[in-house]
From Swiss-Prot:
Disulfide bonds: none annotated. One of its GO terms (biological process) is proton motive force-driven plasma membrane ATP synthesis. InterPro entries: ATP_synth_B-like_membr_sf, ATPase_E_C, ATPase_V1_Esu. The gene is atpE. GO terms for molecular function: ATP binding; proton-transporting ATP synthase activity, rotational mechanism; proton-transporting ATPase activity, rotational mechanism. It comes from the Bacteria. This is V-type ATP synthase subunit E. It comes from Clostridium botulinum (strain Langeland / NCTC 10281 / Type F). One of its GO terms (cellular component) is proton-transporting two-sector ATPase complex, catalytic domain. Keywords: ATP synthesis, Hydrogen ion transport, Ion transport, Transport.
Length: 199
């Protein structure tokens, strides 16, 4: 009986050792699996954090860039408004020329043009009363003295211009309105005005 008990005891002891060994290996494998999952989770967390940081940085850079662009555009807009104001004021000063200076301007401008002398002078409704028949006669005499026709006349047509004149003949116009004259000088003078205003 003692042999049987010894054998049974040995079998139970071996079974317990085998069970402990299996439990130990299972526990070790469980720990390895848990460690691997934790490592993967930490790596994923770091990647998410890094991606979020990059996206936040990109978004911040975009916001800063857009803000700089808006500020630059606002500055350019303000500068352009000031430049436009300078040219608008030039037109206003020309509009406010005394009568004699205004008529001299028209006379000298017309005499400096390469015209035949039989054109029509178109002016604004406000300037129609400034140009009388004696002015036209004087102008025609000067044209005749230059070897041109002396048939210049005031047109019955008015134009919505801010001063100056438009010469018209056979569908062709020479625009010497104050706005056109100031605009023609704009490209030439704009850089000088920018330097004077903003440097």
């Amino acid at each position: 009986m003692s042999n049987l008990e010894n054998l049974t005891s040995k079998i139970i002891e071996d079974a317990n050792k085998e069970a402990e060994k299996l439990l130990s290996e299972a526990k070790k494998e469980e720990n390895e699996i848990v460690d691997e999952k934790v490592k993967k989770a930490n790596k994923a967390k770091e990647q998410i954090i890094e991606k979020t940081k990059r996206e936040a940085k990109t978004k911040a850079e975009r916001v800063i860039s857009n803000t700089h662009l808006k500020v630059r555009n606002n500055k350019l807009e303000a500068k352009q408004e000031m430049i436009n104001k300078v040219f608008d004021e030039a037109v206003i000063k020309l509009q406010n020329l005394p009568q004699e200076e205004y008529l001299n301007f028209i006379k000298n401008s017309i005499l400096s043009l390469d015209i035949e002398g039989d054109e029509e002078i178109i002016v604004s409704p406000n300037d129609k009363n400034k140009i009388d028949i004696s002015f036209i006669l004087t102008l025609n005499n000067k044209l005749k003295a230059k070897g041109k026709k002396d048939l210049l006349k005031i047109s019955n047509e008015n134009r919505n211009i801010k001063g100056g004149f438009i010469l018209y003949k056979n569908g062709i116009e020479i625009n010497n309105s104050f706005e056109a004259l100031v605009d023609s000088l704009r490209d030439e003078l704009e850089q000088e005005i920018i330097e004077a205003l903003f440097s």
